């Protein structure tokens, strides 16, 4: 976990829960007007929505307070900011979502909420978790009236790229210029894979549904639109796809190599100590532990594996007085100290 390699969170969060860094190394604020800003996702997803209320309200305060609006700021351009939020259809059933939507409607702050709706919440169909199986139907009471109070609620198909462009352009304009909050219900979304690497949506979807998802896959339809619009030919897209796949494979391989290098050095250090101990002491379990370390390393070296073995060995040699014991103790202390910085620092920022 290095900020230089993963500046979002130093690898403390899931890979898609990324966020911008708002502070410099000395703790001072960066100029947020000179960068794109994103706050990290949370799980369960609706729990990130109360934060959305505050982010959007900040823009309203900046716009309505003349002193703040006139001054050049690191945080606002006269209150013209829009807070974008994304959530899946099933997470809309969580309480924080409705509380936040109500607060946003009351405050009339610049928000664009995207609800990605693929008719499922992992394996649970919409009709089992959302009234009327349709979140925008449920939210109709929030639709703005002739007084202009409330939300502008729009519905658009996820595979229709031109319609998406038109919808988001309209929503962004309303939110930015008039501080009218918008909800975009993006329907007919598809699920390319299972919810996790161990999941498989083939287990709970009909063959008909799976065929529809293949035919209306958003990336496939986007590709068709590019060709139909004569932006690029099928052959050009095939070439780009092939080049991108090779690029990603190479980058993945290099990233893994860089990630494994310091772990390999620590792994070797532990193995050297254990091998030396094996020659001097009769510890029945030691052969098995060394073998396990070597076998697991074939698939990837992880700090928890060799640190766990180091602790087990340390418990076996507590009464011994030897250089290996001192080295192992120092190694464990060093890793534990470094781990406090890696994983425990700044937890309450």
Where are these regions (language model features)?
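Active-site-proximal beta-strand/loop segments in catalytic clefts of secreted hydrolases
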Residues: 116-117, 158, 187
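Flexible loop/turn segments at secondary-structure boundaries
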Residues: 92-94, 119-123, 161-164, 190-195, ...
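Cofactor-binding active-site loop characterized by glycine-rich and histidine/acidic residues
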Residues: 1-114, 121, 125-143
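Conserved acidic/glycine
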Residues: 189-349
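Long, amphipathic alpha-helical stalk/connector segments used for oligomerization, subunit docking
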Residues: 176-177
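Conserved thiamine diphosphate
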Residues: 63, 75-81, 131-170, 214-243
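Glycine-rich, charged/polar anion/phosphate-binding loops
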Residues: 97-100, 166-173
């Amino acid at each position: 976990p290095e900020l230089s390699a993963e500046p979002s969170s130093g690898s403390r969060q899931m890979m898609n829960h990324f966020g911008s860094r708002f502070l410099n190394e000395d703790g001072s604020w960066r100029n947020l007007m000179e960068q794109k800003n994103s706050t990290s996702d949370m799980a369960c997803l609706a729990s990130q929505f109360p934060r959305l209320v505050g982010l959007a309200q900040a823009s309203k305060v900046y716009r309505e307070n003349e002193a703040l609006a006139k001054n050049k700021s690191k945080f606002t351009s006269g209150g013209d900011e829009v807070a974008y939020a994304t959530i899946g259809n099933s997470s809309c059933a969580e309480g924080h979502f409705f509380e936040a939507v109500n607060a946003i409607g009351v405050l009339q702050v610049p928000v664009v909420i995207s609800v990605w709706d693929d008719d499922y919440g992992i394996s649970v169909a919409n009709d089992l978790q959302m009234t009327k199986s349709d979140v925008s139907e449920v939210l109709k009471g929030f639709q703005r009236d002739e007084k202009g109070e409330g939300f502008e609620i729009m519905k658009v198909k996820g595979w229709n790229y031109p319609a998406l462009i038109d919808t988001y352009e309209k929503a962004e304009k309303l939110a930015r210029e008039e501080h009218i909050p918008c909800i975009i219900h993006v329907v007919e979304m598809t699920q390319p894979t299972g919810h996790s690497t161990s999941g498989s949506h083939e287990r709970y979807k009909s063959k008909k549904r799976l065929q529809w998802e293949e035919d209306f896959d958003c990336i496939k339809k986007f590709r068709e639109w590019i060709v139909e619009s004569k932006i690029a030919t099928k052959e050009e897209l095939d070439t780009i796809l092939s080049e991108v796949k090779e690029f990603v494979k190479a980058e993945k391989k290099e990233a893994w190599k860089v990630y494994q290098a310091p772990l390999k050095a620590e792994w070797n250090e532990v193995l050297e100590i254990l091998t030396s101990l094996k020659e001097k002491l009769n510890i029945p379990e030691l052969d098995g532990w060394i073998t396990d370390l070597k076998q697991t390393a074939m698939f990837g070296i992880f700090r928890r594996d060799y640190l766990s073995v180091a602790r087990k060995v340390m418990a076996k040699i507590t009464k011994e007085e030897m250089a290996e014991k001192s080295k192992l103790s120092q190694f464990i202390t060093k890793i534990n100290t470094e781990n406090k910085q890696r994983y425990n620092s700044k937890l309450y920022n």
